Amino acid sequence: MNILQEPIDFLKKDELKNIDLSQMDKKERYKIWKRIPKCELHCHLDLCFSADFFLSCVRKYNLQPNLSDEEVLDYYLFAKGGKSLGEFVEKAIRVADIFQDYEMIEDLAKHAVFNKYKEGVVLMEFRYSPTFVAFKHNLDIELIHQAIVKGIKEVVELLDHKIDVTLLCIGDTGHRAADIKASADFCLKHKADFVGFDHGGHEVDLKPYKEIFDYVKEGGMHLTVHAGEDVTLPNLNTLYSAIQVLKVERIGHGIRVSESQELIDMVKENNILLEVCPISNVLLKNAKSFDTHPIRKLYDAGVKVSVSSDDPGMFLTNINDDYEKLYTHLHFTLEDFMKMNEWALEKSFIGCDIKEKIKKLYF
């Protein structure tokens, strides 16, 4: 890994008024997106990789030997989109084929942190599911966690803490090894490394799991859950339960809040931030198009939103692609993006000392 990189000249607020994006081509705009000091709150570490990294793993373990590189990417990944969140989850389970040993998992963590640094991310909250990483090859979740923490720390230190990284633990439903209570226990056992707890997999009403979420919250964890993402669900119960029953501080995706003025008012009254992932929403058919993505309505209504990449390995994207889509389709400005990142910093679960450092440096 080539750690040596030119330092990023991050934008300051007083520079924004002098930048005219309308006079720039796409390549020039991407240079600007990179210079935005980004605080990313919603990215699955276990699905954060480049095409080259993924293909190297597939070839190393001799997976799908009869497929070309392009066919491998089509078989495993979701870069061309699909029919639904359910189809995406099934493909993500295929990707778990590559989680075969702890060295690979450590390399994945290093790769993910370094790529986020190159994208101009200054605060990164990664989340991962111990049971998801472990289940295909019966790995030990303790050794998985050690590998991830070691990989993250090594790159953060090599980069002289120019990016700060923390972890959230996901408790899954939806695959054969899913055990949300065991994940909650694991999260609290490693509270020195985790700052929050999430639910992943198929979107479900989490009211029956209230005791588990209360348990991790009482143990010192912050709460965010995936809710209001899946448009195939017949109602908005997942959102109501997240807000009223689990009393979360943030919501992963949450774009269906836009369907209810009552929910818009509730998230504002409770100071809940929505971790919005625009490209993910469109590729999974949870938003009809970028032009009609609900983030515009939510932002204009005064709801706190942030921009995240969700599963960049599955989509073969990076966070700057999301910024490009929001600019070209919904006309968000640099001032809007800076505000979203300030909100993300405010609502981050990382320690107050790091938040204060980032605020002084970039905002």
From Swiss-Prot:
Gene3D superfamilies named among the record's database cross-references: Metal-dependent hydrolases
Chain coiled-coil ranges: none
GO cellular component, one term: cytosol
Sites where the protein binds a purine D-ribonucleoside: H44, L45, D46, D172, G201, E229, H253, D310
DNA repair recorded as keyword: no
Region (Gating helix loop), start-end ranges: 170-184
Cofactor(s) recorded in Swiss-Prot or TrEMBL: Zn(2+)
InterPro entries: A/AMP_deam_AS, A_deaminase_dom, Ado/ade_deaminase, Metal_Hydrolase
Highest rank taxon of the organism: Eukaryota
Biological or metabolic pathway of the protein: Purine metabolism; purine nucleoside salvage
Broadest EC class assigned to this enzyme: hydrolase
Site (Important for substrate specificity for S-methyl-5'-thioadenosine): D172
Cofactor note as given: Binds 1 zinc ion per subunit.
A Gene Ontology molecular function term of the record: 5'-methylthioadenosine deaminase activity
One GO-annotated biological process of the protein: adenosine catabolic process
Catalysis: reaction(s): adenosine + H2O + H(+) = inosine + NH4(+); S-methyl-5'-thioadenosine + H2O + H(+) = S-methyl-5'-thioinosine + NH4(+)
EC number(s) on file: 3.5.4.4, 3.5.4.31
Activity regulation text: Inhibited by coformycin and methylthiocoformycin (MT-coformycin).
Function: Catalyzes the hydrolytic deamination of adenosine to produce inosine. Unlike mammalian adenosine deaminases, also catalyzes the deamination of 5'-methylthioadenosine (MTA), a by-product of polyamine biosynthesis, to produce 5'-methylthioinosine (MTI). Plays an essential role in the purine salvage pathway which allows the parasite to use host cell purines for the synthesis of nucleic acids.
Family, as annotated: Belongs to the metallo-dependent hydrolases superfamily. Adenosine and AMP deaminases family.
Protein name: Adenosine deaminase
Organism: Plasmodium knowlesi
Gene of this entry: ADA
